[in-house]
Amino acid sequence: MFLKSNKIINGPTMYDQFFVFTATGTNNGRVNGATKPTNPTATITVDLINNFPNFMTFAY
């Protein structure tokens, strides 16, 4: 999933801010009304990307 936010003003600089959401999971789905899986896990990684040389990654 890709989400683009509104313009953000950072001091004298106005720039676009981009959020990239990557989600992966194991044993977290259901098929044909199956019971809830035990111990479902999910990992969401959020990358914050600006259009100047800045790159931050948030891993949960």
Swiss-Prot record:
This is Uncharacterized protein 103L. It comes from the Viruses.
